């Protein structure tokens, strides 16, 4: 994994020229084939129930190694096509890490400068990857989480609007549209009989975009959103919406059910998935899987699908203590 990111950095450093608007658009379009198209795997060892199947989408099998490649690509592409983002502007946003890595990977390939605001307690691995990709990092209070990072990004953008394109992933409709146009169709093509979709809430883009498209395909599909059980949790990237700033793209009407996941349960899944499913999961991926298992265990029949946003490579500090 580290080799992958260093390879991206080497590519980035070789881009020293400015492109015409048409060339820039062509280059961003050429990256489309590297985003999405991720495999669905059946979870068959740690969950077994007659009549019920559980599948998980391995989102690290794409550019930048996480589900956030989808939203980052959609946001950047639309901004370039609409003339809001050029090589003369700085791409700016708040992130807990993965969106930033996706932004920095794509921006680097397009020779677009990037500044990211993220909480100071983001994992060491994430910070090192972001810096290796050429991103300027502005660290914000760990106690304010991504809410504090958003506020800092907003202040920076307001201080010099002409210098920045503020992507604002928590407000940008291209976040959820990325999943509406890619994640959901991939699931439908692979598993047209899906009965339940389960996903955690962070920016909420994955749940909102995928959920909307699935409901259009089949209104009987049940959508289950997941949150941490408390504001003080260890699920990096997830939001406890009762105590955090609710993203503007969130649609509270979508979910048929809302479930909570304990951090400790996610850590248990990290261990069992590694031992029995040969899956090296991040805390948020394990939390999604924990929530999906919780749902699947209540069913007599059905096909349950969840998302594995990324693997454990960027969380060695945490995972080495768990395994």
Task: Give the ranges of each region predicted by the language model.
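PLP-dependent amino-acid enzyme catalytic core
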Residues: 12-323
């Amino acid at each position: 994994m580290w080799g992958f990111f260093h390879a991206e950095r080497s590519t980035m450093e070789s881009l020293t020229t400015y492109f015409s608007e048409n060339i820039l658009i062509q280059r961003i379009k050429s990256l489309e084939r590297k985003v999405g198209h991720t495999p669905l795997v059946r979870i068959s060892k740690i969950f077994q129930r007659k009549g019920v199947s559980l599948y998980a989408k391995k989102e690290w099998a794409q550019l930048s190694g996480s589900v956030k490649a989808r939203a980052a690509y959609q946001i950047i592409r639309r901004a370039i096509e609409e003339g809001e983002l050029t090589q003369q502007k700085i791409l700016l946003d708040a992130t807990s890490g993965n969106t930033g890595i996706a932004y920095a990977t794509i921006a680097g390939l397009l020779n677009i400068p990037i500044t990211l605001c993220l909480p100071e307690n983001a994992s060491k691995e994430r910070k090192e990857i972001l810096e290796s990709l050429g991103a300027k990092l502005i660290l914000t209070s760990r106690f304010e989480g991504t809410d504090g990072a958003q506020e800092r990004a907003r202040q920076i953008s307001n201080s010099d609007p002409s210098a920045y394109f503020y992507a604002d992933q928590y407000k940008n409709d291209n976040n959820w549209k990325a999943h509406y146009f890619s994640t959901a169709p991939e699931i439908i093509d692979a598993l047209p009989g899906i009965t339940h979709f389960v996903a955690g809430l962070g920016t909420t883009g994955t749940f909102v975009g995928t959920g909307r498209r699935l409901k259009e395909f089949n209104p009987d599909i049940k959508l289950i959103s997941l949150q941490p059980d408390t504001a003080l949790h260890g699920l990096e990237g997830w939001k406890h919406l009762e105590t955090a700033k609710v993203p503007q793209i969130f649609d509270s009407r979508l979910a048929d059910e809302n479930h909570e996941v304990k951090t400790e349960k996610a850590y248990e899944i990290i261990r069992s998935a590694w031992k029995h499913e040969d899956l090296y999961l991040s805390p948020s991926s394990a939390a999604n899987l924990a929530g999906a298992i919780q749902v699947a265990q209540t069913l007599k029949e059905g096909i349950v699908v969840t998302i594995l946003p990324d693997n454990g490579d960027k969380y060695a500090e945490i995972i080495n203590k768990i395994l």
